[in-house]
């Protein structure tokens, strides 16, 4: 089971993500949403997401600030930025926070699926680390 949190101030984006994740990944993913930076940090405290898709520009605190706050209590969540802003400063800040990928809007269904598949694969590797010494021995 993977816990996915999607933060975006556009309701249509939240519904698109939920719909694509639900129809593609079924019961293997639980998806929660938030429309503001403050709401996403509060939801992250109780929901404990494995994967977070974060918009940059939202009411209240922005996505970068929200990621910083979430990192204080959830050091293992995988962050994916989904934003219409491709400014270098935002990308650099996101990279500094350890974002897995910076996706630009508009985002297609195929890109959502690809990003979720990538995130699930990374989460699986965290949950079931491979013993490289064991592999080298064989």
Spell out what each predicted region is.
Residues 1-132:
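Alpha-helical/coil-rich non-catalytic "connector" segments in signaling and regulatory proteins
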Residues 133-138:
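Conserved small/polar residues in nucleotide/adenosyl-binding loops
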């Amino acid at each position: 089971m993977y816990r996915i949190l999607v933060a975006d101030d556009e309701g249509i984006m939240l519904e698109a993500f939920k719909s694509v994740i639900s129809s593609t990944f079924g019961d293997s993913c639980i998806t929660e949403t938030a429309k503001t930076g403050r709401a996403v940090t509060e939801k992250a405290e109780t929901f404990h997401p494995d994967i977070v898709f974060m918009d940059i520009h939202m009411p209240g605190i922005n996505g970068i600030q929200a990621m910083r706050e979430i990192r204080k209590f959830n050091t293992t969540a995988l962050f994916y930025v989904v934003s219409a802003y491709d400014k270098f400063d935002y990308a650099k800040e996101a990279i500094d926070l350890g974002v897995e990928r910076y996706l630009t809007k508009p985002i297609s269904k195929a890109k959502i699926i690809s990003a979720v598949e990538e995130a699930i694969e990374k989460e699986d590797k965290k949950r079931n680390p491979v013993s490289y010494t064991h592999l080298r021995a064989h």
